[in-house]
């Protein structure tokens, strides 16, 4: 029987497993440091079986919080579902401590039902479904105060016990940074024997350097985890005044913005989305604005075209 991991365990999938100072004194150190002795997490097989009919999984990541990653996830989902009506899309909200997709997709107050084949995700549109821990809380104001192992268990349940059915694309809305949730989902979904495009990532940022600093870390995280990066989306790139029509940079790109960073890190820039108050109001109300003609939807069209062409 394996002992519980130490507090600062790097994780069995890490290249540093069994080799860092936190591993000293752990009864499992010899197992973790020897690749021939590592035990496969039984959850991986359960996840693989449950996700066999999900063609593509797309992680929506951000280095910094507050850059609009969840909003971008919602906009991408809405636009893809509208422009590809014959395809099926799912959204998995794995921001365990801050689930926002139920509100953004207009599903607050919905309930998750259990069936013989597992949890049934909540239907948003004819070709969109959603699963979030927000559906399992008694109140939207409930705080989730969990350590890593419990988050890991919840993510494994979402991946292995939800009846996703046949999906062309599952978008996973993640928390900011590179934390337990990211390590868990990469461990369960990464399959080096699967087609390269079965799991990939998009990183969301804003133009200012304080956000780009953490995007560089996120890019390196993906590379270490062997997750292909489809590209970067620069959110809130500019603001056009509704009265005078002039455009302003709310977050000045002093170091060249996402374009310069993408060139430096050798990743594609998928496009830029403006700061649009109508998007904010629609997301708060859980409404779909992707049918409306605007700078935002024009930019979304170009971004979504690049996403779909990569699969």
Swiss-Prot record:
Listed binding positions for ATP are: 63-70
Keywords for this entry?
A: 4Fe-4S, ATP-binding, Cytoplasm, Iron, Iron-sulfur, Metal-binding, Nucleotide-binding
GO MF term set: 4 iron, 4 sulfur cluster binding; ATP binding; ATP-dependent FeS chaperone activity; iron-sulfur cluster binding; metal ion binding
Instruction: Return the cofactor note field.
Output: Binds 4 [4Fe-4S] clusters per heterotetramer. Contains two stable clusters in the N-termini of Nubp1 and two labile, bridging clusters between subunits of the Nubp1-Nubp2 heterotetramer.
Q: Does the keyword RNA-binding apply?
A: no
Q: Where in the cell is it found?
A: Cytoplasm
Recorded hits in Pfam families, A to Z, give: ParA
UniProt keyword annotation of 4Fe-4S present: yes
Any one GO cellular component localisation term in the record? cytosol
Question: Where [4Fe-4S] cluster 2 is bound, by residue?
Answer: 241, 244
Residues bound to [4Fe-4S] cluster 1 are 9, 23, 26, 32
One biological process term from GO is:
iron-sulfur cluster assembly
Write down the required cofactor(s): [4Fe-4S] cluster
Task: Describe its function.
Answer: Component of the cytosolic iron-sulfur (Fe/S) protein assembly (CIA) machinery. Required for maturation of extramitochondrial Fe-S proteins. The Nubp1-Nubp2 heterotetramer forms a Fe-S scaffold complex, mediating the de novo assembly of an Fe-S cluster and its transfer to target apoproteins.
What is annotated about its quaternary structure and interactions? Heterotetramer of 2 Nubp1 and 2 Nubp2 chains.
Family label: Belongs to the Mrp/NBP35 ATP-binding proteins family. NUBP1/NBP35 subfamily.
The record ties this protein, via PANTHER family, to: CYTOSOLIC FE-S CLUSTER ASSEMBLY FACTOR NUBP1 (PTHR23264:SF35), NUCLEOTIDE-BINDING PROTEIN NBP35 YEAST -RELATED (PTHR23264)
The protein's name: Cytosolic Fe-S cluster assembly factor Nubp1 homolog
Protein encoded by which gene: Nubp1
